Structures are given as C-alpha cells and as structure tokens.
Amino acid sequence: MAVATAGTVSLARGAVPEQIVPVNPEPGSPVFTRPSTATTTGGTAATSSYQGAWGTADAFATLMAQTYGADAVAAAQAAGINPDTLAAFGQIESHFQNVGNTSSSAQGVWQVTDGTWNQYASELGLSAADRSDPVAQAKVASAIISDYASAVSRSTGAPATGTQVYGAYMFGTKAGAAIATESNASTPLSQYVSAKTLAANNMSGWTVGQYQQTVASRMGSGASEAVTS
C-alpha cells in the first residue's frame, strides 16, 4: 500500500505545489488522485548538502541495489535532505519501480505528477525529456521533499521526520503540518483531511495515530529519522 520521493540545489518559489495522494492499497501498482483543494506554502530548498547520519534505514539498501541508487543518494545530499528519507519515499510510493499509472499523470519512482514535475524540473534545469530518468526523478523528488520538510518544520519548531513530511507529501503542506503537530493520537484524521480523500485512500474512520503508525510501518526505520540536518 502506498499510503502515502549534482550539485547544490538552491530554489526559491512563492508556493509549494500540493503533491500526489495515493489511493491504491497495493505497492508497485499505485493509482493517484489530487487533493480536492490546493494547499500552498512558501518554501526554499536547502542550499547546503546534507550533513547528518544516513545509510541505515530499511529502504536504503534496496535503493542502492537499483542502477540509479548512488546517483539518487547524491541528489538527496545535494538538496540537503536525508538519503534515507528519499529511499523511504521511493519504497512507499512505488517499491522503486519506474512506472506510471492509469488514473493520473503521476509517474516514476517517486510518483510525481506532471504539474509538480514541470515546476521543479524547470527550476532544476531539467526538461520533459528527463521525465523517465530515475536520476532526474530523484533530483525533483529531493527538491520537493526539502520544501515539504521546511513547511512542516516551521509548524513543529523542530526538524521534521520522514513520517511527518510524508503527511505533507500525501495530503498537502497545510494538512501535513497540522497532523505533525497533533499531540492526541486519537484525534480523527478527518479533522485535517477531507472525507473524500480519506475514502479514496481507504482511511475513513482513521485516527491520526493510526495513520502515522501505518506510514511508519511501511516506510521502515527511515520514518523516524530527521529529513534535514
């Protein structure tokens, strides 16, 4: 289930586009829909390479087993995010399969939609011709994750974890930040996410705690690691 991502990247943008929302319960054959309402938050990607510890998350070894693994790690470091986080997002989004889907424009290992790809790719000097390249996908996903981590961290006042940032990746930065700061695990997830989106993801009736535990279990040990150093 996807319950739900060389050289220094320096991006400045007025709004972070909402990201894809998975609706298919099986990894490797994801289907995605867009949130019913857009959520935007200003953000700036990291301007220095990632300096924290990494390489021990469950998904990392699987990422490194891919032909593009080392380049994906370099992309994450250049964007200032934890390579373990990029690996965990790739695992939960597609199980590292460079695939599209039949119901939306989401594509690639990190299942980025066309609109999001076009904005970030342009700012990274990439083009539509790079859309199917997992290395280019890693650069775009890393920039997106960096922006989302910044948005969540502004709300929590602390470095965001993989689980917290994935909430923004899945539901948009506003809902993701609210979920990350919710201290009561019994709070209904519907307080922050529309009933339509929850139903599409088979999450109707879920609590915040249930959602976070499910994401963490599917993301692996990288779920609890800080996304930025």
Give, region by region, the residue ranges found by the protein language model:
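Extracytoplasmic
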Residues: I81-D84, Q107, G162
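Short, surface-exposed glycine/acidic/tryptophan-bearing loops
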Residues: G100-S122, N184-L189
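A hydrophobic membrane-anchoring alpha-helix module
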Residues: G209-S229
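Structural recognition of the beta-strand scaffold that forms the well-ordered cores
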Residues: A87-Q91, V109-T113, G167
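N-terminal export signals and maturation junctions of secreted/periplasmic proteins
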Residues: V3-V73, G115, S122-E123
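Export/targeting segments at the very N-terminus of extracytoplasmic proteins
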Residues: T41-F96, V135-K139, S146-T156
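Alpha-helical segment that forms one wall of the substrate-binding/catalytic cleft
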Residues: D114-A178
